[in-house]
C-alpha cells in the first residue's frame, strides 16, 4: 500500500515538474515565431536596427568573397556513383545496352 502511494506521488510530481519545465523551455508562436520555429524576417531590420544591417557591404557575387565552388559537389558525386555502378556491372558480367 505504501509503495503504491509513493509511486502515485512520484508520478504526480514528475508530471507537474515536466509540465512546468516544458512551459519554461519551449518557444511559443505568439512571440514572433511561427509554428515549427520559423521566424518571420519581414521586421528583421527593425529588430536589429538599421545601423547594423546597413553597415554590411552589398556583394554582387558572394562566391568571390566566401571562396565557394562554382559547381556543387553533388553532381560530381552522382556521376562518380553512376560510373562505379557501370564498372561493377561490367565486372559482374552484366551488360548495359543503350538504345
Curated annotation (Swiss-Prot):
Reported function: Stimulates the secretion of gonadotropins.
Main location: secreted
InterPro entries per record: GnRH
This protein's record includes keyword Electron transport: no
Signal peptide residue numbers: 1-26
Protein name, as recorded: Progonadoliberin-1
Pyrrolidone carboxylic acid: residues carrying this PTM: 27
Disulfide cysteine pairs (residue numbers): none
Sequence similarity: Belongs to the GnRH family.
Locations listed in the record: Secreted
Modification type Glycine amide: residues: 36
